């Protein structure tokens, strides 16, 4: 069975145990009413909370669902005696307003480690839904590409954490709630079946492995790419390349050198004579068409990502 514990718009801070917040000096601004001015909390969340509780602020420290530790204490803490196998984690739309991979990654990894300790399971699996696409031009959605990257980085560096790609399933409008719920659940379920229960169920889409420059082209090697193709029969879309100036331009992409589970994509653009870097689906809203033989979409990536501390 599945125990459902969630609240729309909540940030990771609300899901952290209070003792973790109190013990970590990096979280000092999350304590008491300081959280309403904390740089670790997005403007939207702080604004919504102030609107809800401002009449009672002078009476002490009123609770709010977005308050740090509130959702952990009111929900997760009560389930820690249960033999939970793992967690399906779908959250981050509010955190992504703060474009800081180091900060968001630190919060996410802290939450994962604290839950594992609370459940007395140091390897408790986390199946994490990567933020999908959203067709919303507002400022608060600008950091979604970076947040997706952070989620993938955590999945690559923290054992038993898995990132579920949903880049093709989000809204074609500004609705933060993706309309296509079933495929999200199926991908999360298949990831759990494969990674946690050892079932031979496809769950990996094409993912960046390596790249190199070749004259006026960039060659991108993809893994989990058996049967690599496009859903519309056209060339792969949403690729961009940049030269030394760092300005990205749309790239023509051609699938080459399919071999086993890997394939190479050649990228070029008349605007970039000497390319240095490439990226894929690096925007809040994209219309991707690149999939493998299991019809699972390719993961967003960029080759010039900053190196973050583990």
Which residues are covered by each model-predicted region?
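Cell-envelope and extracellular/periplasmic
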Residues: 1-310
